[in-house]
Amino acid sequence: LWHTPNLYLNSKQEKVGKLLGDGYDYLAYFCNSGAEANEAALKLARKATGREKIISFKDSFHGRTFGAMTATGQESIQAGFGSLVPHFSYLTYNYLPDLEQLDETVAAVILELVQGEGGVLPAEKVWIKALSAICHEKGILVIVDEVQTGMGRTGTFYAFEQYPLLPDIVT
């Protein structure tokens, strides 16, 4: 995709935005990078829910800006930069018992449906189904980071289309 400043209407951007949300009740926000998209998703989740806590997963990768780096579940990426953004916790990917930690204090869960830096590890459908149900029940937003898996790279336009999941926010 391409990007021009959001200061004025761009007809091509408008057309692409509509295509990206085609078939879903989604709006598009254009930005410069995957990290910026994830930062916007985290801010939107906190603003929309009024909650601060964000859940991510060990061995995930969401970017190198402060919020996205904090969401990244890898100490090697986070080391050396001082204090991270508060109110982030990390669960074990594809591990059903950890989902019991999701409660009404959580604003959002951010995840990749295929963890690239975690070893090219796809999410298990039973785990996604449970995660989705718990999040829906407790008012937790689901953010799917499609920066590496979207645009047809996994066989469907969005990777989430292969799972029993309709995310609230897609990056």
What are these regions (language model features)?
Residues 1-171:
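Conserved N-terminal phosphate-binding loop of PLP-dependent enzymes in the Aspartate aminotransferase
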